[in-house]
Design a protein with these regions (language model features):
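Short, basic, glycine/proline-bearing loop/turn elements
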Residues: 13-14, 81-87, 114-118
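A secondary-structure boundary/capping signal
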Residues: 28, 44, 65-66, 83, ...
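A short beta-turn/loop motif at secondary-structure boundaries
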Residues: 30-33, 160-161
Length: 196
């Protein structure tokens, strides 16, 4: 299908052009092997984050993206071709969570930012427990990912990225919380996630 071709070409462009432009360094890529369902949980500092992570694995990412990105038709089509689907931020969007669960049940690799939107600085922002909830309900392990340099390369409000060095560190997969975990346990698990 056309979406697969668009995703493949975009992934090659990112790997060849953007990774070189940002002199991107990666460690821990071996934690992204296998064919089973997987949740990738990176910190979020820039609009570049999800794009730069796509070539880390040959598997196609699916991702939750803010609903406003889908309000302009050409951008909505491109985002969907890249595997994104909309989520209403700041609320428990049951429809998006249901779609994410179905994808994971089918063995997908799902990108979820535990901080929700982009944050500034080195401190971890307020964490949401969506990744923990999805992991608990589907049994998918969660891989924490650290990203440094994307905020300097393309801060909020900046339209064109600067050539700053970007470093990505992929941590080992963490087993999911217990399926029957209560909300407080999911929050505690989420706090531990990015501490890793």
């Amino acid at each position: 299908p056309v979406a697969s071709v668009v995703y493949g070409l975009t992934r090659v462009f990112i790997r060849v052009v953007l990774w070189s432009y940002f002199r991107l360094g990666v460690s821990g890529r071996e934690h992204l092997t296998g064919d089973a369902a997987l949740i990738i949980a990176p910190v979020h500092r820039s609009n570049l984050d999800s794009f730069l992570l796509a070539p880390l694995t040959r598997r196609r990412f699916r991702s939750l993206a803010k609903e406003s990105l889908f309000q302009v038709r050409p951008l909505a089509w491109f985002m969907a071709a890249l595997g994104a689907f909309p989520v209403r931020r700041g609320s428990a969007d049951r429809e998006s969570l249901r779609a994410a669960r179905l994808l994971l049940d089918e063995g997908a690799t799902l990108l979820v930012f535990p901080e929700g939107g982009r944050q500034q600085g080195d401190e971890i922002g307020e964490l949401f427990d969506g990744a923990a909830y999805l992991a608990a309900r589907t049994g998918a392990p969660v891989v924490p990912v650290g990203i440094a340099g994307t905020e300097e390369a393309m801060a909020q409000g900046v339209r064109l990225p600067r050539p700053c060095r970007v470093q990505v560190v992929v941590g080992p997969a963490l087993p999911p919380p217990d399926r029957s975990a209560k909300r407080s346990a999911l929050r505690a698990w989420t706090a531990d996630l990015l501490a890793n």
